[in-house]
Each structure stands twice: as C-alpha cells, then as structure tokens.
Amino acid sequence: MKREEAEVAVVGGGVIGASLAYGLVNRNPSVLLIDKENMELTASRGNFGLVWVQGKGFGMPRYADWSIEATEHWPEFASRLEEESGISLDYEKTGGLEICLGTQEFEERKNFLGQMQEQSKDGTYPCEMLSRSDLQSKLPDIVLGDEVSGASYCPHDGFVNPLALLKALHW
C-alpha cells in the first residue's frame, strides 16, 4: 500500500463518494478517494439510476428543495462528465410517474403531494396528479389495468445508467 497525502480524503468510491470527490477536485486539486479494491459488490452497481424528485424530503423541506435543485443541475453535470470522461451516461430527463392503484391510493398520493407543497418555501411543488384518462393519454401504447386510478407526475424526474455514471466518475 502506498502512502498518499491530500488536503481532503473521501472514504467510499461509490456514486456518492465519487461524486463528492469529483466536485471537490474542481475546487481543490488535493483530493484523495479511498475505496476497497473490489467494486463488484456495491450498492452503486445495483441501484436503478433514478434522478428523482417525487416524494423526497417529506418533513424535511430543505432536503426537498435540494432534490429539486439537484435535478435542475443534472443536464449540465451529465454533459460535462461525459465530455471529460468520454463515457455516455445515457441520462434522460423524461419525467416520472408514480402509478396509483385504486381510489384510496390515488387520494393518499394527492394528499401527500399537497403536504409536500405546503412545506415548500414558496408553496409550490413540481408534481401533479393525473387522472386515469390523463395517464392513458401520456401512455397511449399501454393498456392500463382495471385497478389503475391515475398517477402522480413530475417533469423533473429522469434516469441515468448507474454503471456508466460510476465508471465515468472513476475515469
């Protein structure tokens, strides 16, 4: 093991640790990323790659705001990381749906989003409820099951290839 010196050490080379190190190295070139040798069995390799706002930060308004702000920075971040690493992240900001089954689940989701809106600093929250017919209009090629009552939709939601992201952060 060779000894390294740095002003900042980040322990953990998964998506979170590697992202922190990536951000820090742009401010301070003396950053050391410490991780185990085998990256095969990590949570970062098994995640879904969701860049998601919906439902994050309930009871924690600042976290909810950060989630929204973070998704607003994703296109620029993904573009810059792809350019620097030469690795396509397959990032897409498609918007996201949370499907509701039955009237009760639809009403619970609607109330939840209302609470998220109430806790926000400006009284807004970037998600909306879609009726079953509105949802069907968004998904014209999909036959909705009888229990589907609608969905919540957030235009900020999207996804990234988590394996490509991890590889690009480690380039």
Regions found by a protein language model. Name each.
Residues E37-M39, L135, L169:
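Short beta-to-alpha linker loops that shape the active-site pocket of alpha/beta-hydrolase fold enzymes
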Residues S152-W171:
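Helical element adjacent to the flavin cofactor pocket in flavoenzyme catalytic cores
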Residues A6-L33:
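N-terminal Rossmann-like FAD-binding beta1-loop-alpha1 element of flavoenzymes
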Residues G23, E76, N111, A168-W171:
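Alpha-helical scaffold segments in soluble metabolic enzymes
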Residues V25-N47:
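Glycine-rich FAD pyrophosphate-binding loop
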Residues M1-E5:
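A short, basic/flexible loop-to-alpha-helix module at the beginning of a structural domain
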Residues G49-K138:
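Dinucleotide-binding Rossmann-like beta1-alpha1 core, especially the glycine-rich loop
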Residues E40, S137-G145:
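FAD-binding beta-loop-beta segment adjacent to the flavin cofactor pocket
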